[in-house]
Structures are given as C-alpha cells and as structure tokens.
C-alpha cells in the first residue's frame, strides 16, 4: 500500500473538488517506510492538503461576496485578494507550490470570467463607429464603378415607374455627371487609327508634345501644320518648333524663287513685240511636256493603288472604279454593292443604278448618274474643229 499518493502521480493533478475543508484525513500505511523518499512524499502530501483546504474556503467566501457586473467593486476586491494571498502564502514561497495553488484556484477562474464579461459589455461605441464596412468606401478613384452605380440607380427608378426605358434620362446621366471616364486606360483599344497628338493636347501633356516635336525636321513640321486645326494649335503653342517651322518656310520660298528665276524673265518678255511668237511657242512646249509627265505620274500612282487594293480582296470580291472619285472600289457581285477605298470618299453605291446603296429595295426609276464626257464637243477639240470644217 502507498501512503496518500503514488510515486508516478504529479502534484498538478490534484483538484480542490475531491478534497473538502472539514474532512481531511491521510491514509496511514500499515507498513513502515524505511526509505527516505517515501517519507518525503508523506510530508509533501500533508503540505498540499493544508494548502487545498485554505484555497477552497477562500474560494467559497469570494463566490458569496463577489458582486456581479460592477467594475469598481471588482477592482477593490482584487486588491483585497492580493493582500490576503501575500499574507497567507508567504510561508509557502520557498516550497515551490505557491504558483500551483494560484493557478488551480476556482476564485481566479471566476474573476477572470467576470472581467472578460465586463470588457465585452462595455466596448466603446467610437471604435464600433470607425469600423466601416467595405461597401461604404469612397469610389472617387474608381470612375467606372461610379458610373455603374449611377446608371443602375436611374434604371431602377425608371423600372418602378414604367417598363420602358427613357433614353433621354440616360443621356442626361451620362452627360451631366463628371465621372472621369476620359481617364480610363484602354477605352480606345481596337481602333485602326488614333490621333495621339490630339489626345495629348486635350489632356494637357505639353512636355510630351515638345519631346515629339523636337524629333521632327522643318519639312515634317510644315506637313504637321497642314493636317488639322488641332495640330496647328499644338505647333503654335510650342515656340521652338514654331520658329523652326518659320525657318523651313523661308527656305522653301527661297528655293522656289531660285527655280523660277529663268521663267520670270520669259514672262516679262511676253509683252515685247520682237520674238514674242517664238517665246510663246517655247513656253507652250514646256507646259505640254510638264502636263504629260504629270499624267504619267498619276497613271502610275493609280495603277499602284489598284494593285494594293487587289491584294486585300477576298475570294468573292473584285475591283471596280468608284463613281464619284474614280478610285478603286471593292465590288461584291452577289449584292451588287461597291465601296470606295479612298479615305476621303468611301462612297457606298449600287452598281446597277450608280446611286447610294439601298439594300433589298428596287433601284430608282430616274436615270443613273453618268460621269462620261458630254455629247457636245468641247471648244478647241478635234471634233469641234471637224465640225467647223464641215460648215
């Protein structure tokens, strides 16, 4: 028989419920313990029994006297408990069991629970107000979400009143609100042509425009200023680029003056009486040679245009001449429809009546537009001369 405890049992497994304050008895072993270890265990058990007795009685008193949900009384009671514990457990500080007694006491568990309840019930309201949900955050930096919210709210209001959509109200919402949609990235994606200089000018990126214009020569600047009014404004606001443009214009004028120096004397000599007829003949021969060279250049350019457009045709398409500008047009024989490929024209016409394409409707009864040479000969032409000879 072991006396009180076994050698393998640790002192932490003791519970205050199994021991009572009034009936505390140790089991006496009938066999004498000759070894000093067993005798030390008996002394150790006696210390623990007395300590547990004191903690149980103190825990019961605190349960009866402890007020509920009162912070000031709790703090006052905690102070009293600390003084009592220092006085009562002063003799057990050297034994090493005072920490076990403080941790296992039921009084401390109850006080901790009461303090936690008070802290949960008395949470400050300001802290709860500052905790805003995520959906109430500002959307100033999110223009697409702002526009979406505005459109959804207007459509809901319209749905309540009538099932039809009032597009005028939708246009008012789109035009009236400053959502900042112009600053969205990727809104111009998919476009074949895009005016980068105009966009930079509208967004007031002057430093980028100056960097771009510095890389252009004088001839390039002359071409830039003749593109559009916005490009002209861009060039006029940049002083260095505008000055280089002026210098380029002066150089061009000087070159033209040098080229036309020999023709100027000839023009002045036309008013002279002697050798005037000879000079007129020479001038006319030069003009005819220039016209012929220009016509050859135009024909070569048109031939190149038709070849370029022919490379982009589909299997069921062919080429035709535009009715308005005589440029290459893509012709669909199944629909009898042709569209001009020139950017400034892009005339979509019916090949049967040479009018604007009318879809499945019948062609107009009026005569088609004829862009051929009129029946009457022009004055000075071969036909007119022949007619005069006949007369």
Curated annotation (Swiss-Prot):
Record keyword Ligase present: no
BP GO terms, sorted: cell division; negative regulation of exit from meiosis; negative regulation of meiotic nuclear division; negative regulation of mitotic metaphase/anaphase transition; negative regulation of ubiquitin protein ligase activity; positive regulation of cell population proliferation; protein ubiquitination; regulation of cell cycle
Key word Nucleotide-binding present: no
Location, primary (coarse class): nucleus
Localization: Nucleus; Cytoplasm; Cytoplasm, Cytoskeleton, Spindle; Cytoplasm, Cytoskeleton, Microtubule organizing center, Centrosome
Pfam families reported for this sequence: F-box
Chain ranges passing through the membrane: none
Residues that, per the record, bind Zn(2+) 1: 322, 325, 340, 345
Record keywords, A-Z: Cell cycle, Cell division, Cytoplasm, Cytoskeleton, Metal-binding, Mitosis, Nucleus, Ubl conjugation pathway, Zinc, Zinc-finger
Post-translational modification: Proteolysed; proteolysis is induced by both cyclin B-cdk1 and cyclin A-cdk1/2 complex through probable phosphorylation. Proteolysis is inhibited by pin1 during G2.
Pathway: Protein modification; protein ubiquitination
One Gene Ontology term, aspect cellular component: cytoplasm
Zinc finger (ZBR-type): 318-366
CDD domains (alphabetical): BRcat_RBR_FBXO5, F-box_FBXO5
MF term (GO), any: ubiquitin ligase inhibitor activity
Domain free text: The C-terminal region is required for APC inhibition.
Function, as annotated: Regulates progression through early mitosis by inhibiting the anaphase promoting complex/cyclosome (APC). Binds to the APC activators cdc20 to prevent APC activation. Can also bind directly to the APC to inhibit substrate-binding. Required to arrest unfertilized eggs at metaphase of meiosis II, by preventing their release from metaphase of meiosis II, through inhibition of APC-dependent cyclin B destruction leading to stabilization of cyclin B-cdk1 complex activity.
Stated name of the protein: F-box only protein 5
């Amino acid at each position: 028989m072991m006396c009180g405890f076994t050698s393998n049992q640790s002192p932490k497994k003791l519970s205050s419920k199994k021991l009572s304050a009034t009936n505390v008895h140790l089991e006496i072993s009938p066999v004498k313990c000759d070894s000093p270890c067993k005798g030390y265990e008996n002394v150790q058990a006696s210390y623990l029994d007395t300590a547990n007795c004191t903690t149980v009685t103190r825990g019961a008193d605190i349960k009866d006297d402890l007020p509920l949900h009162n912070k000031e009384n709790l703090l006052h009671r905690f102070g009293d408990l600390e003084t009592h514990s220092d006085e009562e457990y002063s003799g057990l500080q050297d034994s090493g069991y005072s920490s076990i007694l403080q941790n296992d006491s039921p009084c401390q568990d109850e006080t901790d629970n009461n303090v936690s309840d008070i802290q949960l019930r008395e949470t400050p309201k300001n802290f709860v107000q500052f905790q805003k949900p995520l959906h109430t955050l500002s959307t100033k930096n999110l223009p697409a979400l702002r526009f979406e919210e505005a459109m959804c709210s207007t459509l809901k209001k319209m749905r309540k009143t009538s099932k039809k959509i009032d597009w005028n109200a939708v246009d008012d919402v789109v035009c009236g609100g400053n959502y900042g949609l112009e600053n969205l990235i990727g809104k111009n994606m998919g476009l074949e042509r895009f005016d980068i200089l105009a966009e930079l000018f509208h967004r007031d990126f002057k430093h980028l425009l100056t960097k771009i214009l510095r890389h252009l020569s004088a001839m390039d600047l002359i071409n830039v200023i003749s593109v559009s009014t916005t490009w002209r404004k861009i060039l006029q606001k940049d002083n260095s680029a505008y000055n280089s443009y002026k210098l380029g214009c002066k150089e061009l004028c000087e070159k033209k003056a040098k080229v036309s120096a020999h023709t100027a004397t000839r023009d002045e000599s036309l008013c002279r009486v002697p050798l005037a007829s000879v000079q007129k003949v020479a001038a006319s021969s030069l003009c005819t040679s220039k016209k012929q060279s220009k016509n050859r250049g135009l024909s070569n350019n048109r031939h190149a245009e038709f070849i370029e457009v022919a490379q982009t045709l589909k299997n069921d398409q062919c080429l035709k001449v535009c009715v308005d500008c005589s440029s290459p047009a893509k012709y669909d024989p199944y629909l009898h429809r042709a569209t001009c490929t020139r950017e400034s024209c892009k005339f979509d016409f019916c090949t049967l009546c040479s009018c604007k394409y009318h879809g499945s409707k019948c062609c107009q009864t009026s005569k088609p537009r004829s862009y051929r040479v009129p029946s009457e000969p022009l004055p000075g032409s071969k036909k007119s001369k022949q007619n005069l000879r006949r007369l």
